[in-house]
């Protein structure tokens, strides 16, 4: 809401579509486009070969009939097998140079309570299978991903074409935003939170949106920064000063000025009356483009406080 987002229809959860994912998995099985495999994860990796020239081999269970695969898949859902004992794989292209297309796993057995679905499921769709299905259900036209998912796009398209028979949604990739002297990885930021090094995700030292908000950044300054940084498919490093310049430019036009002395030195004006006080009108924002005509009263007396760095008993040449 702080950034202006107001999701129509509420917040969507991927787990709400588990029933549809299961339905579409059965569709692929009946069409001969998916099969239940008995290979372990390590064996599956060995059979798939590598993109360095090692050829793949078909699983001994790749040619099971649709009827047998459907029966096994339903028994997977019923909890008749152990974790890793059975896996549902898409039947695509074992000779593809793209490893993601060499019969990827699309369902695994996992006996774990889900934070929203409870114990309803003991099989779960893999990300590359659930992602395009969820996008299609929600009417997404373009799914924006970071560059590490670029090689996953052919699989994304395969799922869309073979389940929905449409061109949309489409996946597009862009480079992650990296900033100088700043940790951006969620994994490392989580460590800072869990170790108590920071006070939480909204600690002003954190490069999170809630952290930036507590530090004083406005939503509009963040939008300005994102527009200036732009979208690229090349990895780049943005100078943190660019973000700081965005908020500084905005505050220069909107913030009223106040004065503070951090390292004070007392200054006494000997030739100014001790009992006299003069008040001067000072502009709250001297920037002419700010359109702020308000002023405030500032007192001038015999005793003043100045910054220590602004004082020198023996000033250097050209000291001001």
Where are these regions (language model features)?
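Active-site cores that bind ATP or allylic diphosphates and position pyrophosphate for catalysis
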Residues: 13-14, 20, 24-189, 199, ...
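Short beta-alpha connecting loops at secondary-structure transitions
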Residues: 8-10, 144, 207
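Helix N-cap/coil-helix junction residues
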Residues: 5, 165-166, 217
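Alpha-helix capping at helix-to-loop junctions
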Residues: 2-5, 27-34, 231
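Long, charged, mostly alpha-helical binding arms that flank functional sites
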Residues: 169-246, 250
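Short, compositionally biased low-complexity segments
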Residues: 1, 43-51, 129-132, 194, ...
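A glycine-rich helix N-cap at a beta->alpha junction
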Residues: 1-15, 25
């Amino acid at each position: 809401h702080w950034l202006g987002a107001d999701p129509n229809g509420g917040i969507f959860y991927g787990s709400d579509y588990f029933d549809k994912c299961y339905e579409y998995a059965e569709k692929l099985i009946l069409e001969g486009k998916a099969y239940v495999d008995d290979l372990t994860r390590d064996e599956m990796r060995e059979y798939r070969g590598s993109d360095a020239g090692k050829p793949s081999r078909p699983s001994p269970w790749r040619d099971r009939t649709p009827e047998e695969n459907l029966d096994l898949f339903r028994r997977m859902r019923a909890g008749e097998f152990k974790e890793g004992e059975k896996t549902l794989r898409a039947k695509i292209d074992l000779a593809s140079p793209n490893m993601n297309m060499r019969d990827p796993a699309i369902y695994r057995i996992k006996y774990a309570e889900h934070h929203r679905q409870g114990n309803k499921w003991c099989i779960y769709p893999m990300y590359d299978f659930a992602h395009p299905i969820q996008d299609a259900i929600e009417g997404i036209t373009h799914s924006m991903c970071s560059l590490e998912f670029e090689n996953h796009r052919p699989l994304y398209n395969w799922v869309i074409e073979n389940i929905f028979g449409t061109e949309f949604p489409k996946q597009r990739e862009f480079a992650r935003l990296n900033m100088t002297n700043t940790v951006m990885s969620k994994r490392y930021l989580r460590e800072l939170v869990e170790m108590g090094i920071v006070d939480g995700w909204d600690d002003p030292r954190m490069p999170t949106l809630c952290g930036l908000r507590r530090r004083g950044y406005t939503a509009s300054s963040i939008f300005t920064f994102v527009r200036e940084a732009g979208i690229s498919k090349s990895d780049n490093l943005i100078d943190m000063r660019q973000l700081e310049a965005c908020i500084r430019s905005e505050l220069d036009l909107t913030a009223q000025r106040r004065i503070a002395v951090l390292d004070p030195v007392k200054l006494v004006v000997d030739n100014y009356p001790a009992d006299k006080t003069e008040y001067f009108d000072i502009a709250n924002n001297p920037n002419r483009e700010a359109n702020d005509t308000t002023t405030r009263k500032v007192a001038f007396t015999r005793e003043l406080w100045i910054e220590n760095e602004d004082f020198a008993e023996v000033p250097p040449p050209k000291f001001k």
